[in-house]
Amino acid sequence: MLKLIEDAIERTSAAPQASAPEVRTQSDIDEELKKLLEQIQAKIYVVGVGGAGCNTINRMMQVGIQGAKIIAMNTDAQDLLKVRAHKKILLGKELTRGLGAGNNPKIGEEAAKESEREIREALEGADMVFITCGLGGGTGTGAAPVVAEIAKKMGALTVAVVTLPFTVEGIRRIKNAEYGLERLKKNTDTVIVIPNDKLMEVAPNLPIHMAFKVADEILVQAVKGITELITKPGLVNLDFNDVRAVMKDGGVAMIGIGESDSEKRALEAAQQALNSPLLDVDISGAKGALISISGSDVKLEEAQQIIELVTSKLDPEAQVIWGIQLDEELGKMIRILLVVTGVSSPYSVAEEEEESYFGEEERRPIKLDLDEL
């Protein structure tokens, strides 16, 4: 066995021999296989809704996400113009005239309903739809649940990845966020919740504008980590059905992120992910978990240590899936993204309270005639 391992390492390291026969890489069968793979590859769409969602989309386009179509949706024409995406949709052209939703989720909701046909066309053929937004404002809070409802009715596995506002942003945004979260829970398979306040525990001295950037980065890593386990060749890949099994009807999900480059990097990274302030819930009753392991030289033994540690914290009946992605930029570091689904969530509000969230400040959707201004 040792010799077999040594031979495998030697073949990997050795330079190709000049006398080796040339291999045809563009044969007819290769082309047929490529076409077949294109047909059976899961179609994954990532939709950023509202200002925060579109900021996340910009970051995704910057870092790159393999095998996903990126769509930006907003009621603010000026903000939408600045976004890089494969497709853009200005929501509620007649209702808002591109001026935004004014922090009113009701306007965001009506704007998305006005643009339902465009949304349906943009999501046509999707197997999985990620919806990213920051809850608390008008467009993301109001429109994201409408987009989610459309995607789910079209048969796509629908996963929202959302941030909750910092406490310092005020009670109105917090109440708006609670309203939006309840509606998303009804219209998605899984909602991954990232409470911004928890970032203060990770980096308490972070300036507020940088804290928002960190929140964007966590959203990006969550979506990218899950997507590329399906779409990007790696040491251990998942297929779409694996992910569907864990995320379908997954309810509220939380994430933990850990990384380490020490001698015991695998265990330390796993422990960090499990103890992450972002994962500040009891996971013992969770329905499932997805573990994404990244590194330039992850060993099989290290992967085993990570899986065993995580599964030891979960219900024995929980469904756990995992994959390994090669990332040369991490050097000697191992990074773990842990997504735990079906957790008991503190982010629930009574259904009968929903209509009172906007109070006296609520504004009804209006049409603006700019020619009269």
Curated annotation (Swiss-Prot):
Decide whether keyword Nucleotidyltransferase is in the record. Answer: no
Q: Enumerate the CDD domains for this protein.
A: FtsZ_type1
Cell division keyword on record: yes
What InterPro entries does the entry give? Cell_div_FtsZ, Cell_div_FtsZ_CS, FtsZ/CetZ, FtsZ_C, Tub_FtsZ_C, Tubulin/FtsZ-like_C, Tubulin/FtsZ_2-layer-sand-dom, Tubulin/FtsZ_GTPase_sf
Q: Which PROSITE patterns match?
A: FTSZ_1 (PS01134), FTSZ_2 (PS01135)
Keywords, A to Z, come to: Cell cycle, Cell division, Cytoplasm, GTP-binding, Nucleotide-binding, Septation
GO BP annotations, alphabetical order: cell division; FtsZ-dependent cytokinesis; protein polymerization
> Record's superkingdom?
Archaea
How does this polypeptide assemble, per the annotation?
Homodimer. Polymerizes to form a dynamic ring structure in a strictly GTP-dependent manner. Interacts directly with several other division proteins.
UniProt similarity note:
Belongs to the FtsZ family.
List the protein's name. Answer: Cell division protein FtsZ 1
